[in-house]
């Protein structure tokens, strides 16, 4: 295998693994189970926010080859600075601790009966060790951890599908595509794209690619994004279909929280597919998937603040330690509590992130500061009702929900953002033509 192909595979595997965390493994099977006969349409919706948008985010990184700051600087440097800080605080305060909580509840507690504090402390100590060995992250994840994760996932999906009766239950979901889109929010993959994309770029620079031609790195990152996206598509579609076809044979206690329903369903599928060994496989899978994601989040956060403060290695180390300590503290909460906090935040920050990703892959003439500012302002304004509704202030936003298209599906920002983009593009073209 030549060096370029090897580099492509390692980068693709690392990118896949940095994306694939707790939610990515737990969400799809229960989504398929609830969708039943409509599992295909749920899959389409899920792929939009969990695969397509994140991979477009990687393409934007390939184009910019900078930091997360570059995503929003056309709105204004102040906006971009605030956006970056908010994104990284969210990343280390919600999805990173969530990986520890999921590892404890599903993999560790059932086997060893340890306390959440002990699990989180050991977990983030190991994360810190990997993050402090910054130059080796890409190889450690891409060469060793990811292939193991992918092989085990394909085994569970393949055996599960081959032994199922290919019958589904009646769908419990009224709007499958919309439900899939909103479930895709909970993977955090769009936010993950802007965070881990920067991790990949810094990692490539560590591997002596800093002097490589801009176009060479862009090609490598783009190809890696497509390969990782294809892998995510196959795994997600497989997990959703297994949940739909095989899940009907497994009893899911409706009185449990949705998070424990997800865990129990996946455990049931694993055991039914692989026997008692399936429980061990699931525990290892979740632990590794969560671990690699936590490494990416902490490393990405430390990279950003290091670059922000004159490339200081001390800042990198201190930021990594703070992120890991925060992970230990928040990681002691149960998975459900973390998700409850995450949903309102996601409904506000996710639309902004999606719009920034899409604008950054537009042709230059359609990605001017005027267009950026107009579309982002529109997106923020029309995301506020979704945020307020999620924090039990629904009565204040009910009049807006009744008027704004798609607002009842928590997608009220979509049409205003699109119309603002069209109008501002026309205005921009007119300004350009008049000069």
Outline where the language-model segments fall.
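Select transmembrane alpha-helical segments in multipass membrane proteins
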Residues: 5-15, 40, 76-89, 118-122, ...
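Extracellular/periplasmic helix-exit of transmembrane alpha-helices
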Residues: 230-264
């Amino acid at each position: 295998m030549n060096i370029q192909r090897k580099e492509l595979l390692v980068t693709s595997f690392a990118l896949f693994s940095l994306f694939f965390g707790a939610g990515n493994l737990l969400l799809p099977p229960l989504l398929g189970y609830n969708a039943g006969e409509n599992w295909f349409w749920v899959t389409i919706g899920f792929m939009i926010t969990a695969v397509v948008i994140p991979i477009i985010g990687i393409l934007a990184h390939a184009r910019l080859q900078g930091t997360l700051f570059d995503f929003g600087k056309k709105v204004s440097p102040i906006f971009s600075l605030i956006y970056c800080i908010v994104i990284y605080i969210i990343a280390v305060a919600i999805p990173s601790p969530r990986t520890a909580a999921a590892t404890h509840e599903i993999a560790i507690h059932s086997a060893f009966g340890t306390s959440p504090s002990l699990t989180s402390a050991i977990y983030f100590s190991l994360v810190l060790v990997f993050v402090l060995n910054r130059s080796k992250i890409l190889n450690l994840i891409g060469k060793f951890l990811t292939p193991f994760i992918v092989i085990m996932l394909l085994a569970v999906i393949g055996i599960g599908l081959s032994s199922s009766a290919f019958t589904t239950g009646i769908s419990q979901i009224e709007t499958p595509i919309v439900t899939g889109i909103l479930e895709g929010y909970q993977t955090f993959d769009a936010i993950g794209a802007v965070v881990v994309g920067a991790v990949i770029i810094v990692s490539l620079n560590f591997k002596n690619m800093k002097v490589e031609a801009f176009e060479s790195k862009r090609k490598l990152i783009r190809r890696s994004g497509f390969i990782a996206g294809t892998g995510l598509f196959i795994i997600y579609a497989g997990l959703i279909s297994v949940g739909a076809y095989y899940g009907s044979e497994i009893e899911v206690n409706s009185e449990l929280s949705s998070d424990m329903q997800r865990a129990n369903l996946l455990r049931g599928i694993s055991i039914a597919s692989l026997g008692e060994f399936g429980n061990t496989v699931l525990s290892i899978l979740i632990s590794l998937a969560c671990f690699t994601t936590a490494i990416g989040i902490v490393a990405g956060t430390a990279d950003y603040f290091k670059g922000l403060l004159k490339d200081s290695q001390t800042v990198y180390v201190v930021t990594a330690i703070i992120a890991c300590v925060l992970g230990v503290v928040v990681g002691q909460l149960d998975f459900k509590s973390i998700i409850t906090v995450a949903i309102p935040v996601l409904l506000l920050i996710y639309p902004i992130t999606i719009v920034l990703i899409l604008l950054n892959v537009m042709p230059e003439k359609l990605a001017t500061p005027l267009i950026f500012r107009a579309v982002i302002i529109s997106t923020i304004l029309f995301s506020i009702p979704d945020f307020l509704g999620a924090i039990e202030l629904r009565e204040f936003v009910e009049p807006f929900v009744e008027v704004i298209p798609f607002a009842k599906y928590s997608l009220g920002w979509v049409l205003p953002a699109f119309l603002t983009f069209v109008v501002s593009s026309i205005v921009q073209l007119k300004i350009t033509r008049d000069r």
